[in-house]
């Protein structure tokens, strides 16, 4: 029987949102899961699993599938948004009228605002006001492994210390899911956006056939780009050596569960952008993130040569091999002070 209030309302019933809802419910919490497609929600309720992406993971009894947005939002004090970054602002506008006076917002979306490159915290503040507590979770997480209960660790940053502790307690499970609090709200957000871009580059490199040396060099210099941009925005450099930085970057650049990596591999193998996106069949966050990270880097005058070349491939039709040669042919640099 459903209680008066759930521990968490998850907005976004894709693979990752569903995996997080399953994890919370498996921890013994009542969780409400809402998605924008009523037919899809009805199918989730009928099957009691996500047949498309997580067919082997049954929903715990405490996971409640909800089709009505107002009911989903008011069911819990804490609202977890797990949607693609390009619709993040639109979703906040949708949920705003239904938020409770004591609502708190957390998101697992990795990216920046479409076109503007703004951090999602700025979108949330502009849309929902200054008083609502905000938080973000990020780190090396593939939905299938998380839903299956395989060991996973993430970073959590919040604007409010009490909210951070509450979320850590809700999410943390000693058997499989470890949650690290991190006070760097900017850095935890930024890492998840930049790693998507670098993962496309790693995929391109492997698709061309450049080998492990090249992939590792690209990951390492990609981390340098992430750190430079973070420093310009006031992030803590240590964050980028943690779960939301290096952890997520390595995972996304090296494992074929990553859509961004697979997308890049197809480009390196000769697919055009549209064909590669169609073949993936799900949102490739790094495609839009590349444009937005470039905008943000230009705003802060941060040199990001890998990001620039990936942008040239995705939006200007540059050949992937030519992009790689452009990177290799750059002038000599000092490792710690050059781009």
Swiss-Prot record:
Location in or out of the cell: Cytoplasm
Binding-site list for NADPH: 15-16, 36, 110, 143, 259, 283, 285
Enzyme category, top tier: oxidoreductase
Catalytic residues as annotated in Swiss-Prot or TrEMBL: 195 (proton acceptor)
E.C. no: 1.1.1.94
Catalytic activity field: sn-glycerol 3-phosphate + NAD(+) = dihydroxyacetone phosphate + NADH + H(+); sn-glycerol 3-phosphate + NADP(+) = dihydroxyacetone phosphate + NADPH + H(+)
Gene Ontology biological-process annotations: carbohydrate metabolic process; glycerol-3-phosphate biosynthetic process; glycerol-3-phosphate catabolic process; glycerophospholipid biosynthetic process
One cellular component (GO) term of this entry: cytosol
Family listed: Belongs to the NAD-dependent glycerol-3-phosphate dehydrogenase family.
Protein name: Glycerol-3-phosphate dehydrogenase [NAD(P)+]
Organism name: Erwinia tasmaniensis (strain DSM 17950 / CFBP 7177 / CIP 109463 / NCPPB 4357 / Et1/99)
Lineage: Bacteria, Pseudomonadati, Pseudomonadota, Gammaproteobacteria, Enterobacterales
């Amino acid at each position: 029987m459903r209680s008066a209030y759930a521990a968490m309302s998850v907005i976004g019933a894709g693979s990752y949102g569903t995996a997080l809802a399953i994890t919370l419910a498996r921890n013994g919490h009542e969780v409400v899961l809402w998605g924008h497609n009523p037919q899809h929600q009805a199918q989730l309720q009928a099957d009691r699993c996500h047949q498309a992406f997580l067919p082997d993971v049954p929903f715990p009894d405490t996971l409640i599938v909800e089709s009505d947005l107002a009911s989903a939002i008011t069911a819990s004090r804490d609202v977890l948004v797990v949607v693609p970054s390009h619709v993040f602002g639109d979703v906040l506008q949708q949920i705003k009228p239904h938020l409770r006076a004591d609502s708190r917002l957390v998101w697992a979306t990795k990216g920046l605002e479409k076109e503007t490159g703004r951090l999602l915290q700025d979108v949330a503040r502009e849309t929902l006001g200054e008083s609502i507590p905000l938080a973000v979770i990020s780190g090396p997480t593939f939905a299938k492994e998380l839903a299956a209960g395989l060991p996973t660790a993430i970073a959590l940053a919040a604007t409010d210390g009490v909210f951070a502790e509450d979320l850590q307690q809700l999410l943390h499970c000693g058997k499989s899911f470890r949650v690290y609090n991190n006070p760097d709200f900017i850095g935890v957000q930024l890492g998840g956006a930049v790693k998507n871009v670098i993962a496309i580059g790693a995929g391109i490199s492997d698709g061309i056939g450049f080998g492990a040396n090249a992939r590792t060099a690209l990951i390492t210099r990609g981390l340098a780009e992430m750190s430079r941009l973070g420093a310009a925005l006031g992030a803590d450099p240590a964050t980028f050596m943690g779960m939301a930085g290096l952890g997520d970057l390595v995972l996304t650049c090296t494992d074929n569960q990553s859509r961004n990596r697979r997308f890049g591999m197809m480009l390196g193998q000769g697919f055009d952008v549209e064909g590669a996106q169609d073949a993936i069949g799900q949102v490739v966050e790094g495609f839009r993130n590349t444009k937005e990270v470039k905008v943000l880097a230009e705003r802060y005058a941060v040199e990001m040569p890998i990001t620039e070349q990936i942008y040239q491939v995705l939006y200007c039709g540059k050949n992937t091999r030519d992009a790689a040669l452009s990177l290799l042919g750059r002038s000599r640099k000092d490792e710690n002070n050059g781009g």
